[in-house]
């Protein structure tokens, strides 16, 4: 049976959108909280996420590097109601470990896998700044993302 994926993040997050696109490429079903949760689900998930964060139980597939990781500034995900994870770059590898359809996302050739990871990391760093600059600076007078974020989290 395919895994059930729950994402916790805001619509404005490019990392959130990247994880959703990976799940879509694998034809896996997912839900994005808090937007697609009912009130009880949203509150219970938020409380568990906060508690797990305080207790240091939020994980990163592939391991945690103290001082180098972005935790907790990126979206979170859960597979089949398990522990929370973060890091959109490791999401595809995590899916590949639990779902055969996701294995095609990671090339078997180590050199190609390196190139895929390099491009992913480069766009996470460089591309993110272009997105944020356009969203919050260039389009500030015409872009609704700030208002949408307030409504979504409000």
Region annotations inferred by a language model:
Residues 1-154:
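GST-like domain detector, emphasizing the conserved glutathione-binding G-site
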